[in-house]
From Swiss-Prot:
Species this protein is from: Nitratidesulfovibrio vulgaris (strain DP4) (Desulfovibrio vulgaris)
Record-level Gene Ontology MF annotations: ATP binding; glutamate-tRNA ligase activity; tRNA binding; zinc ion binding
Protein's name according to its UniProt entry: Glutamate--tRNA ligase
Catalytic reactions of this protein: tRNA(Glu) + L-glutamate + ATP = L-glutamyl-tRNA(Glu) + AMP + diphosphate
SUPFAM superfamilies documented for this protein: An anticodon-binding domain of class I aminoacyl-tRNA synthetases (SSF48163), Nucleotidylyl transferase (SSF52374)
Main function: Catalyzes the attachment of glutamate to tRNA(Glu) in a two-step reaction: glutamate is first activated by ATP to form Glu-AMP and then transferred to the acceptor end of tRNA(Glu).
GO biological process, any: glutamyl-tRNA aminoacylation
Pfam families: Anticodon_2 (PF19269), tRNA-synt_1c (PF00749)
Locus of motif 'HIGH' region: 10-20
Family: Belongs to the class-I aminoacyl-tRNA synthetase family. Glutamate--tRNA ligase type 1 subfamily.
PANTHER family per UniProt: GLUTAMATE--TRNA LIGASE (PTHR43311), GLUTAMATE--TRNA LIGASE, MITOCHONDRIAL-RELATED (PTHR43311:SF2)
Spans through the membrane: none
């Protein structure tokens, strides 16, 4: 099926949100699975709400997610002549007509239909009037008066609509601009799109678009409508559920492979498997495993999954990724230094922001170590400071200041004074890092270096 063509068609009226990102991922995976093409189209016909900054943001998010597209980027705003040529074709073939009914009258028709318990729709007053173009006039599709539209949805199975409930939809507005459904059908057909995967909030558009495909003599693509992503409370996902735009997840310190993995699993499954490399997703993805029931967004699970990818990433790559977050904390440090630190700290973070923060005490000079008051009160007692001074003397005379040497120096002090490790280690740990937590003490000491460690111990003794 190398002739498979899918598309993603966002509107640049906001940043790319996770629902749109999931749609893009599904279409990208389907195209890549079959060795087909993935088209990216910017639906910017709403000139009042469309902004270049949002287009730029969407493109940046697509690239960050690793979703490349084939061919040129398509802008609907540059294709009005093409849309109008197809509208003219529909007028010439009798599948469309001019309508002069003003919007307030059309709304009145719909209210009258509602009052009778009918679907609110235009009553077709101008269908047989043979009007031509004129100020304030629109072009409408002449929909069949009866019949059913039935199609095999890739997710929902057989779906049917009663044609009598459909409106004679507007194809060209009074200002000459084509409408959404007309532009989408013309674009998908002329670009050879074979499969349309989208959210089920678009399901009501599908019968209208099928009528247009039929009127224009185009072959129908396969449609698949995936359920919307819900919040943990099973209501429509929103920011109050912790959902963010893709750009916010990037700024928050998530890894793109984690977000892709998570969003794919919100609507697609392959047995009980949770973690997939991108290449594995391309290999295994298929519409037959798209879920017909809505999935709930779980920010904690996303955090867990991101933590997994943090720990699977090589130290060198993770250092490169966390570098800008460390810089945002105010530190000028090179990636090679971070590559030494991240193996110690990535178990203690689930995102890059957290990783940068938990390494902070390793990057400040001794004079700027921030001490936790409770930890100081508990560990740096008079006895605790005496142990810190003793360990300091043992460390100062080490020949090689490495992990093994630091560990032996602490051990020798403990053994030589008839003490237990738990009597000494907490005080030394607080002296070095300012708090009780952190990775192994000898590991941190070795990475800090002799001068820094001794300076930290001296400062703690003087508290």
């Amino acid at each position: 099926m190398s002739n498979v063509v899918t598309r993603f068609a966002p509107s640049p009226t906001g940043h790319l949100h996770i629902g749109g990102a999931r749609t893009a991922i599904f279409n990208w995976l389907l195209a890549r699975h079959f060795g087909g093409r993935f088209v990216l189209r910017i639906e910017d016909t709403d000139t009042e709400r469309s902004k270049q900054e949002y287009t730029d943001s969407i493109l940046a998010s697509m690239k960050w997610l690793g979703l490349d597209w084939d061919g040129d980027l398509i802008y609907q705003s540059e294709r009005f002549d093409i849309y109008n040529s197809y509208i003219d074709r529909l007028l010439e073939s009798g599948h469309a007509y001019w309508c002069e009914c003003p919007p307030d009258e059309v709304e009145k028709m719909r209210e009258e239909a509602r009052a009778k318990g009918l679907k609110p729709r235009y009553n077709g007053r101008c269908r047989s009037r043979d009007l031509g173009p004129g100020d304030g006039r629109v072009v409408r599709l002449k929909a069949p008066a009866e019949g059913r539209i039935v199609f095999d949805d890739l997710v929902k199975g057989t779906v049917a609509f009663d044609v009598a409930e459909l409106d004679d939809m507007v194809l060209r507005r009074s200002d000459g601009a084509p409408t959404y459904n007309l532009a989408v059908v013309v674009d998908d057909a002329t670009m050879g799109v074979t499969h349309v995967l989208r959210g089920d909030d678009h399901l009501s558009n599908t019968p209208k678009q099928i009528l247009l495909y039929q009127a224009l003599g185009f072959d129908l693509p396969r449609f698949g409508h995936v359920p919307m992503i819900l919040g943990p409370d099973r209501k429509k996902l929103s920011k109050r559920h912790g959902a963010k735009a893709v750009i916010e997840y990037e700024q928050y310190g998530l890894l793109p492979q984690a977000l892709v993995n998570y969003l794919v699993r919100l609507g697609w499954s392959h047995g009980d498997q949770e973690i997939f490399a991108l290449e594995e997703l391309v290999e295994k993805f298929g519409t037959e495993n798209l879920n017909s029931s809505a999935a709930g967004f779980d920010p904690d699970k996303l955090e867990w999954l991101n933590g997994h990818y943090l720990r699977e990433t090589s130290p060198e790559e993770l250092a490169r990724l966390v570098l800008p977050f460390v810089a945002a904390e105010g530190f000028d440090v090179d990636a090679s230094r971070l590559a030494q630190l991240v193996p110690l700290f990535r178990e203690r973070a689930n995102n890059l922001v957290e990783l940068a923060r938990v390494m902070r005490f390793m990057l400040v000079p001794a004079a700027e170590v921030e001490y936790d008051a409770a930890a100081v009160a508990k560990a740096l007692t008079e006895e605790g400071r005496r142990h810190v001074a003793g360990v300091r003397e043992a460390l100062a005379v080490l020949g090689i200041f490495d992990r093994e040497g630091c560990e032996k120096a602490i051990h020798d002090y403990v053994e030589g004074n008839g003490l237990k490790f738990k009597q000494v280690a907490p005080a030394v740990r607080v002296a070095v890092v300012g708090a009780m937590g952190g990775p192994g003490l000898p590991d941190m000491m070795a990475l800090l270096g002799r001068d820094d460690v001794l300076a930290r111990l001296d400062r703690a003794v003087a508290l």
